[in-house]
């Protein structure tokens, strides 16, 4: 028995780190959620890695302009020396005959250092000029990725805030119906209401509770989606601290009304793409001009009939040379011209894409502005309408309580109130989404 208890305690202690980790709680404003995502979202992480990859690629290009130094060494054992036929008369022999002579030694060793230095290569120098733009190109991609994640977090975060408001309205309606049911039962007990009136209220209560259950489930799923966007463990708990008001929906939009293409990160990105295409054209043009390089080597060579290279006193012979290499392209079968033309066509494609993006941006800004204006107007109307529906419901309820109103009237007022609340919730969500889309379209998000 003691062993069983000890085993349970061991299991509990083993699970404590897991339980603790599962109960991590994060209270987050919208900005804190965005900052968390910038550090933990996988897409942002990979975009940042692309910047580092480009930095290493730039180092590789830079390295080609530095001296290239290498050491080499070899050792050869000549198992069979080559034999040459030499006229015998060279050695006092019979004219017209030949002697077989083996030339060489059994062992050869060579060691040395080689240096190559690029002095001028237009293609390499163009690559060096493009390094900064290439880094900025990848950094701009990081900004675009962050902006996309930021926009999605805006929408999901405020969707959850709006859903909380929706849940509060459902709870308020449940309280109203419970009180109305209680009052109706009292009236029924006193003979002023029918059992059917109570049954109708029970149906409405069941429907509202079902709606609440669905809303709670949707909110839970929304939190899961927010965690995925932020790169947060699913087991962690998130508590949203920001609220939503009409003033927040209007705040910052006036500044966004002043718009410039250069404020859009995707427009900046495609501009950099055009510049990189220009570097391509320049690089291929440079392939038609001469290249100049310097090479040098210094070697030591030794020859032995016995393997005694490491003994002192043996002779080693120095070999050294310096070479200036000039390569002048004369004819490449029109391949260079074809590469230049292809690069120019690709650059024109990028320019065309930039012009197409301008049209797309114009459309996005105008549509987003129209949607925002309409959404804010609808929000104002629906807020007033919800207040009016609440007033109508309260007045109808009072009439019902004093016996001058019917159950049909109060059911209608309840239905109208619920419809007005639903319309307000939808208008509130549509307004904040329209604001996010407008800020993103104008490059102000």
Please tell me what each predicted stretch does.
Residues 45-49, 62, 119-146, 196, ...:
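Sec/SRP-type N-terminal targeting helices
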Residues 24-25, 72-113, 243-251, 295-328:
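Small/polar, glycine/serine/threonine/aspartate-rich low-complexity segments that form flexible
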Residues 210-232, 387-444:
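Short segments within alpha-helical structural elements
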Residues 1-2, 56, 146-261, 371, ...:
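Periplasmic alpha-helical coiled-coil/stalk elements that build and connect Gram-negative outer-membrane
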Residues 33, 40, 47, 117, ...:
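Amphipathic alpha-helical coiled-coil segments and their boundaries
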Residues 1-31, 41, 425, 431, ...:
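Bacterial Sec-dependent N-terminal signal peptides
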Residues 22-74, 80, 234, 240-278, ...:
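Bacterial Sec-pathway N-terminal export signals of envelope proteins
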């Amino acid at each position: 028995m003691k062993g069983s208890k000890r085993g349970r305690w061991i299991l509990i202690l083993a699970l404590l780190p897991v339980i603790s980790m599962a109960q991590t709680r994060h209270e987050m404003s919208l900005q804190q959620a965005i900052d968390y995502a910038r550090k933990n979202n996988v897409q942002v992480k990979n975009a940042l890695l692309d910047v580092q990859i480009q930095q290493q690629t730039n180092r590789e290009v830079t390295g080609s302009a530095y001296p290239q130094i290498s050491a080499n060494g070899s050792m050869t054992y000549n198992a069979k020396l080559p034999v040459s036929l030499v006229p015998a008369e060279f050695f006092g022999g019979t004219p017209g005959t030949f002697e077989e002579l083996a030339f060489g030694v059994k062992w050869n060793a060579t060691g040395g250092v080689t240096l190559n230095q690029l002095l001028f290569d237009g293609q390499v120098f163009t690559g060096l000029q493009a390094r900064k733009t290439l880094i900025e190109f990848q950094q701009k991609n990081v900004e675009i990725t962050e902006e996309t994640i930021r926009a999605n977090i805006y929408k999901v975060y405020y969707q959850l805030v709006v859903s909380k408001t929706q849940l509060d309205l459902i709870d308020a309606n449940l309280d109203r119906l419970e009180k109305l049911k209680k009052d109706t039962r009292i009236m029924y007990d006193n003979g002023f209401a029918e059992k059917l009136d109570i049954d109708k209220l029970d149906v409405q209560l069941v429907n509202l509770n079902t709606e609440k259950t669905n809303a709670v489930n949707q909110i839970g799923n929304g939190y899961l989606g927010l965690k995925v966007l932020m790169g947060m463990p699913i087991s962690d708990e998130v508590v949203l601290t920001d609220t939503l008001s009409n003033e927040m929906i209007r705040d910052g939009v006036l500044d966004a009304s002043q718009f410039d293409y250069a404020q859009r990160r995707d427009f900046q990105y495609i501009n950099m793409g055009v510049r990189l295409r220009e570097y391509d054209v320049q690089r291929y043009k440079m392939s038609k001009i001469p290249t100049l390089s310097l090479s040098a080597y210094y070697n030591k060579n030794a020859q032995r009939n016995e393997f005694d290279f490491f003994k002192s006193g043996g002779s080693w012979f120095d070999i050294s040379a310096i070479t200036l290499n000039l390569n002048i392209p004369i004819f490449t079968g029109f391949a260079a011209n074809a590469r230049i033309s292809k690069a120019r066509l690709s650059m024109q494609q990028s320019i065309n894409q930039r012009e197409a993006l301008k049209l797309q941006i114009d459309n996005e800004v105008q549509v987003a502005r129209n949607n925002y204006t309409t959404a804010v107007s609808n929000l104002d109307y629906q807020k007033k309408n919800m207040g009016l529906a609440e007033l109508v419901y309260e007045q109808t309820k009072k009439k019902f309580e004093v016996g001058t109103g019917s159950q049909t009237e109060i059911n209608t007022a309840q239905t109208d109130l619920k419809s007005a609340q639903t319309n307000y919730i939808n208008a509130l969500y549509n307004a904040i989404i329209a604001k996010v889309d407008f800020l993103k379209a104008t490059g102000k998000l």
